[in-house]
Amino acid sequence: MLEEKAKDLGRQIGQSTEYQALKRSNDLLTEDVEASTVLRRLTQLRSEAQQFIERGEDPPPEMEQELDRLLQTVEINPVYQRAIVAQTNFDKLMVRVNEYISEGIRTGAVSKIITLS
């Protein structure tokens, strides 16, 4: 019963406009060569900067400048902006879903009636 309801919830989330918009925007972001290249480089630089920090060192100023430049580049990309908006909207949906689940758990925890359907 619980597994069925969870799968149904997952199916409904997958059919939601928020998820569909997220999927479309991520597909477009993947297809955008410039944005993908910048995002890969950002990920690489962040990882390298983290290694410096873990060693107790400051990342070189050139690295910080490149990170800033890449962030500015990607933040003005309309495909990236749509992906961020879609992710934010999906995150809001998932927060609401989690609130509904928590509410159901609280209600179920105090209920003396056991339902099997």
Language-model-detected regions and their locations in the chain:
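Terminal, compositionally biased segments used for targeting/anchoring and flexible tails
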Residues: M1-S117
